[in-house]
Amino acid sequence: QRQMCIRDSYGIKFAVIRNFRGAPVHGYISRNKDGMYQMITTIRGAYADIFWFSLFHELGHIVNGDIAKDSDFIDVSDGLDLEKERAADLFAQDSLLEPKSYADFLQRGDFTLSAISNYANTQNVMPYVVIGRLQKEKHISYSAYSDYKVRYGWANQ
C-alpha cells in the first residue's frame, strides 16, 4: 500500500513496454512541465522478481529526486552515477523486503522453500521475490528453486 501512495502522491503515469533488441534500458522516466512523471519499464529478461525490483528501483529514482523537471532519465545502469543507482537499488530492496526482517531471516539461515514461502508471506510478496534476492546475493545458487520463479511474457508471443 505504501507503493500506491508513492504513485498517487508523485503523480506517476506508468506503462510497461516491450524491450527492444540491443537496448540496455530497463526503465525510462520523464517529468512533464506540470510535474507529472511518466515511468516506463520493460519485462526485459522476463523474470517476475527482476521486473518488480526494476519497478521499485525506478520509483526510487523518483522518490530520491533524481529526475529534474523537464528532463528525461534513462536508467541504463551503466555506472555513470553509481551513487544514484545504489540509492535506487536500496530503495527497491527495502520496499520489497523490510530490512530488519530480512536480516533476521538471513541470520536464521533456513533457506528451504517452506521457510522462504513463510517469510515471503510476512512481507506480502510472492516467494519468487525472496528467491531472486537470495540468488542475487549468492545465499543460494541460481539453479535453486528455479521452478518457482515466474516468467512474464506478452500474450501474443
How would you label these PLM feature ranges?
Residues 1-3, 8-157:
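Active-site hotspot residues in diverse enzymes, especially metal/ion-binding acidic/histidine motifs
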